A protein has these predicted regions:
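Short Gly/Pro-enriched turn/cap motifs at secondary-structure boundaries
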Residues: 138-139, 203-207, 279-282
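RNA pseudouridine synthases
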Residues: 1-199, 222-224, 306-325
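Short coil-to-beta-strand transition motifs
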Residues: 79-83, 204-213, 284-285
Length: 325
C-alpha cells in the first residue's frame, strides 16, 4: 500500500525520517527505526524521486510517498473521528477554517494520538461527499490559538498551501509582549534555525533560513500595566516559532512564553494583573486574521478568529482589549 503525504510549513527544514514518523503516527510499528529502514530499502520517494538519505531535509509542499509492507498495513489503527467543541469560522466545498483553542494539537502525534483538530475534522467529514479526504493545510503550536485551515480534497490542500506561501497571503497574529514598544511599526528580518543543542528550540543564526515578520503596535498597557504592548504581527515567511523568536530577539518576549520568554511580570505595578501574568499558562499569541485569494474560486477570502477567553481576560485587565477589535 502506498501512503502519500503532502508536507506543510511546519515540516520545512525537518529530517525526512522525522517527518514520516509524525505523519505516520496512526500506524502501529512505524517507529523511527522502522521508518529509517524503509528509506534505506528504497521504499520512499520525494517529489517522485527515490531518496535513500534518512537525514534528507524536506520543504513545505513536498510530496512524499512510502510503499508500506503488508504487515504494517494490517496492523494499522484508523485515526478516530471525534466530536470536539470547535468553532468553524468558514466552510465551503473545498476548505474549512477552524478557531483552534489553546492546548489543542492540530495533528495526531505519538504523544497525542487523539483529541486533535484532525480528529474533529474527520468527525465533521462524515457529512461531506464520499470522495472528500480531509487534511490540515497549516499548523499552530499546541499553546497558540487561532485560525487553522483544513482541506476537503488533495487538490484543494495543495492549492491552498501554495496560496498561503510567502507574502501572497496576509497572515496576522495578535501578540501581547513585555516591553514598551516606542515605534508604531517595523520589520524584523532575522535568519533563524533549529538549535543544534536542542532541536525543540529555534535560535537566531546567520546561517539560518531567511525569516521576515512585519509588526504594528496596536496599543500599550494603561498606567498600571506599563510594560505591556499589544502588537499585530504579519508573517512574510512562516518558520517554526518565527514570531516567538523574532520578538524575543527584539527585546519584546511574549507574555507566558516558557521557551523564549522571561519572567518580566515582576515589573508590572498592578498586583492583580501581575498575578494574572505570572499564572498565564501559555504564550500570548493568537492567529487572528487571514486574507488570501481562494485557490479554487479566485475570490478574496477573509477570515477572523476572535481571541479566546483566556487572552480576552488578560487584554481586558491590561486595558488593551479594545485594540484587538
Amino acid at each position: 500500500m502506498i501512503r502519500r503525504i503532502v508536507t506543510d510549513r511546519g515540516d520545512s527544514g525537518q529530517r525526512l525520517d522525522l517527518v514520516f514518523r509524525r505523519h505516520l503516527a496512526d500506524l502501529k510499528g512505524a517507529t523511527r527505526t522502522q521508518v529509517q529502514a524503509w528509506i534505506l530499502d528504497g521504499a520512499v520517494t520525494v517529489n517522485g524521486r527515490g531518496v535513500l538519505r534518512t537525514a534528507a531535509r524536506v520543504a513545505a509542499g513536498d510530496v512524499l510517498t512510502v510503499d508500506l509492507p503488508a504487515g504494517v498495513v494490517t496492523t494499522r489503527t484508523a485515526m478516530p473521528a471525534q466530536e470536539l467543541a470547535l468553532v468553524t469560522l468558514y466552510e465551503d466545498e473545498h476548505l474549512i477554517a477552524i478557531n483552534k483553542p489553546p492546548g489543542l494539537v492540530v495533528h495526531p502525534t505519538y504523544r497525542h494520538p487523539e483529541g486533535t483538530v484532525m480528529n474533529a475534522l474527520l468527525w465533521q467529514a462524515r457529512g461531506w461527499r464520499e470522495s472528500d479526504r480531509p487534511s490540515m493545510v497549516n499548523r499552530l503550536d499546541k499553546l497558540t490559538s487561532g485560525i487553522v485551515i483544513g482541506a476537503k480534497t488533495a487538490r484543494a490542500h495543495a492549492a491552498m498551501q501554495r496560496a498561503l506561501a510567502g507574502d501572497r497571503a496576509a497572515k496576522e497574529y495578535l501578540a501581547l509582549v513585555y516591553g514598551r514598544v516606542v515605534r508604531a511599526r517595523g520589520t524584523i528580518d532575522l535568519r533563524i534555525r533549529r538549535d543544534p543543542g536542542d532541536r525543540r528550540r529555534v535560535v537566531a543564526s546567520s546561517g539560518g533560513a531567511p525569516s521576515v515578520t512585519h509588526w504594528e503596535r496596536l496599543g500599550r498597557g494603561r498606567a498600571e500595566a506599563a510594560g505591556l504592548t499589544l502588537l499585530k504581527c504579519r508573517l512574510v515567511t512562516g518558520r517554526t516559532h518565527q514570531i516567538r523568536v523574532h520578538l524575543a530577539a527584539s527585546g519584546w518576549p511574549l507574555v507566558g512564553d516558557a521557551k523564549y520568554g522571561q519572567p518580566l511580570w515582576r515589573d508590572i505595578a498592578d498586583a492583580d494583573l501581575r498575578e494574572s501574568l505570572r499564572a498565564f499558562p501559555r504564550q500570548a499569541l493568537h492567529a487572528w486574521r487571514l486574507a488570501v485569494t481562494h485557490p479554487m474560486t479566485g475570490a478574496t477570502l477573509r477570515i477572523e478568529a476572535p481571541p479566546p477567553a483566556d487572552l480576552h481576560r488578560l487584554l481586558t485587565a491590561a486595558g488593551l482589549v479594545q485594540c484587538a477589535r
